[in-house]
Amino acid sequence: MNAIQKEKAVVLLSGGLDSATAMAIAKDMGFQVYALSFSYGQRHTTELEAAKRVAKTLGAVEHQVANIDLTCFGGSALTADLDVPKGRAPEDMEKEIPVTYVPARNTIFLSFALAWAEVLETSHIFIGVNAVDYSGYPDCRPEYIQAFTAMANLATKAGVEGRTKIEIHTPLIDLTKAQIIQKGIALGVDYGLTHSCYDPSPEGLACGQCDSCLLRKKGFAEAGIPDPTKYIP
């Protein structure tokens, strides 16, 4: 029996492909999963319905949806009236930080996860960041996670008292999108329940052309697995 089988873990769950896989990995490691999602004013609120489906299917002990309003700051195509880039080549995605980057989003999300982890008296947090097939986000890099972990252990009661050491698990950080999909399939993830698109139709269909959709399509193609996503015709 896994030594950490009964430990709790907070998993950041957007409803997308990566976070669903991270949650499945946490479950496979034996953790009791507490899923945390955010309604932050994002244009792609369809992902919240996906998060609810994934949390239920993968057996989260509890699923919290925190309401925060990042539209008051704007600064991103996901939270303001800015166009979402379409049709970009993968190499172009890596040249600059895109307008779909939400300022400090992962720092905000991880801070909420850290607070909940303290309440749950656990030191384990999972986040599905990826530094291989990614859209140039600065808060998806290993050095960012290392820095946040160091801060977390200085900023929490448990960390200061030396009772536990906060650990931020990033099981996908060195995997390609294809490898992530293959890992998820092996763990029984139903990717038909997930949603990745930044600019879906009113009916919730994926646009097929934003960075997130293109990376998703590329991942399924390279993994040799049919893409279950419903795209706009």
UniProtKB/Swiss-Prot annotation:
Its EC number is 6.3.4.20. Its cofactor is Zn(2+). It catalyses: 7-carboxy-7-deazaguanine + NH4(+) + ATP = 7-cyano-7-deazaguanine + ADP + phosphate + H2O + H(+). The keyword Zinc-finger does not apply. GO terms for molecular function: ATP binding; ligase activity, forming carbon-nitrogen bonds; zinc ion binding. Signal peptide: none annotated. Pfam families: QueC (PF06508). Catalyzes the ATP-dependent conversion of 7-carboxy-7-deazaguanine (CDG) to 7-cyano-7-deazaguanine (preQ(0)). This is 7-cyano-7-deazaguanine synthase. The gene is queC.
